[in-house]
Amino acid sequence: KCCMRPICTCPCCIG
């Protein structure tokens, strides 16, 4: 999952 990466640009991380 991209949310697990150091730099996250996914909607699930941004809110």
From Swiss-Prot:
It comes from the Eukaryota. GO terms for molecular function: toxin activity. Disulfide bonds join 2-12, 3-10, 8-13. Expressed by the venom duct. One of its GO terms (cellular component) is extracellular region. It is found in: Secreted. The modification 4-hydroxyproline is found at residue 11. Keywords: Disulfide bond, Hydroxylation, Secreted, Toxin. The keyword Nucleotidyltransferase does not apply. Belongs to the conotoxin M superfamily. The cysteine framework is III (CC-C-C-CC). This is Conotoxin Reg12d. It comes from Conus regius. The lineage of its organism: Eukaryota, Metazoa, Spiralia, Lophotrochozoa, Mollusca.
